[in-house]
């Protein structure tokens, strides 16, 4: 693997981990800072990733649209949502000790009524960050890893690193009190999402289907069909 590729992966891990840690600290709950820390690193990294992909003549290949991309994205969203719903209801159901994982996570995102009042801005933010994350993780990072492990498994390795970048949130989202402790919800969600979106990028050879699936899933679990509480 080239030093520049290894360096980019390291920076992506560090920047995403640092941003996600601060995004999910209690003082960022429901504030603009949450969205800045959560999405800012991906937006910055995606600019460098896109510039590299353009020089390597990969950007056009990644974003060439094809008929049915949106439908593929919807199917991917439905699959991931079903997996997330099943996981939550099996591992952290309402009334269980692990419900606190979801309580702290959704509490961090903010007041549902305030989110609904700013729905267009939230939608634009989700779309931009989802696109940026796909460029970084399913695009650049996967391509860099393919140089080392081959294209057949690079997408799975990228999903693992994507999940690793969210491990710091296990500390920032930890709950206090007798039911407290580390909160693994986001690393688990990132692993599941990374595998689904990475698999889509691998199968279809492009990013639009995974971008649609990523953005729609985030919109669904935040704004339309939350996995905990009422939005």
Describe the residue ranges of each PLM region.
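Juxtamembrane "helix-exit" motif on the non-cytosolic side of transmembrane helices
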Residues: 19-28, 90-91, 168-175
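Membrane-interface helix-boundary motifs at transmembrane edges
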Residues: 27-31, 58-68, 142-150, 201
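Hydrophobic alpha-helical transmembrane segments
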Residues: 10-27, 62-70, 97-106, 127-136, ...
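Juxtamembrane helix-loop-helix connectors linking adjacent transmembrane helices
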Residues: 31-32, 58-129, 178-182
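Alpha-helical transmembrane segments in multi-pass membrane proteins
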Residues: 2-57, 103-112, 120
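Alpha-helical transmembrane spans of integral membrane proteins, capturing the lipid-embedded, hydrophobic core
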Residues: 9-13, 42-43, 73-85, 122-126, ...
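Transmembrane helix-loop-helix hairpins at the membrane interface
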Residues: 116-231
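Alpha-helical transmembrane segments of integral membrane proteins
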Residues: 3-11, 34-37, 68-76, 117-121, ...
């Amino acid at each position: 693997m080239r030093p520049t590729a290894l360096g980019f992966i390291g920076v992506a891990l560090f920047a995403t981990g640092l941003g996600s840690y601060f995004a999910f600290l209690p003082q960022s709950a429901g504030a603009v800072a949450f969205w800045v820390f959560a999405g800012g690193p991906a937006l910055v990294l995606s600019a460098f990733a896109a510039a590299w992909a353009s020089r390597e003549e990969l950007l056009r290949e990644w974003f060439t649209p094809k008929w049915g991309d949106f439908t593929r994205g919807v199917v991917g969203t439905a699959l991931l949502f079903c997996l997330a719903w099943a996981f939550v209801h099996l591992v952290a159901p309402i009334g269980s000790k692990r419900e606190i994982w979801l309580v702290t996570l959704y509490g961090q995102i903010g007041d549902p009524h305030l989110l609904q009042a700013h729905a267009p801005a939230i939608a634009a933010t989700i779309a931009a960050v989802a696109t940026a994350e796909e460029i970084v993780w399913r695009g650049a990072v996967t391509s860099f890893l393919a140089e080392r492990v081959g294209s057949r498994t690079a997408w799975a390795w990228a999903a693992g690193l994507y999940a690793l970048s969210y491990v710091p949130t296990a500390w920032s989202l930890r709950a206090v009190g007798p039911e407290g402790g580390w909160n693994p919800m986001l690393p688990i969600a990132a692993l599941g999402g990374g595998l689904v979106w990475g698999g889509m990028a691998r199968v279809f050879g492009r990013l639009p289907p995974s971008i649609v699936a990523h953005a729609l899933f985030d919109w669904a679990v935040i704004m339309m069909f939350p996995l905990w509480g009422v939005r």
